[in-house]
């Protein structure tokens, strides 16, 4: 069977620091849908880019990598309700119809609501995207101007058809209830995000904060081979400021291309803009001085962590280049 892979797609730069709140890896799930006869709705929440397998069929017809409904033979439209993996403010939507060429919806709209207890009875749905025309086999990026916090979304497709992937980009909203709980303060699901980086030729630093261990070498941050003096770096914001108790640096799958050393600098800043952080970061205090790396290994540090107050941002220095799969910063959320 011939398998076609989705063409490379570069997110608009403004979205590179945003989190996909509808990512199944952080707990996003389909609650209910009007119909998913041809392809299960949960597929459109998968992290992996869609594929097309030319000769793959199942009992319902052509297998498609996404959500696809049957052909509508009466008035109405199809819809799907999704519980976001984490609550947050929505900045943009990507309704991706890749490989849906003669079966994509004519148009789509999207609503959102805040229901922290997942009780949608009487939920007040707000329109996030008015009914908008869609095209075949392409990404549709829509910017959203709404400061509200949402937990659920409802995608409406008119009148029927298929969507390969739905991505809901935004900023994670963390409800702090326990300051004594130890969390990975850098994790994607806890609001960690990438701000800037020196290079991402083979793998984006946003992978560093993904859930779980890396599935392969592509699921990590990897830079090109350095042919000049210096080293590579990336700056990340913690989801919530806190005191760091344990650091993990995982080089899973990086065997001939792991860095020689890694160090971490840190700072606490309340109101700095992302643009201000980049030139300042080289002067931040060290949280972890340069440590030698091993291939395909989880490196754990506790006693090596230098004295510090609470931390809001870090700079990871990868010396001189190479690849890292994950970085974890375990600690407690600081009290205001």
Curated annotation (Swiss-Prot):
Entries under InterPro entries matching the protein: Allantoicase, Allantoicase_dom, Galactose-bd-like_sf
EC number: 3.5.3.4
Keywords, sorted A to Z: Hydrolase, Purine metabolism
Gene3D superfamilies: Galactose-binding domain-like
Pathway: Nitrogen metabolism; (S)-allantoin degradation; (S)-ureidoglycolate from allantoate (aminidohydrolase route): step 1/1
Alphabetized SUPFAM superfamilies for the sequence: Galactose-binding domain-like
Any Pfam family hit: Allantoicase
HAMAP family reported for this sequence: Allantoicase (MF_00813)
Full protein name: Probable allantoicase
Gene name in the database record: alc
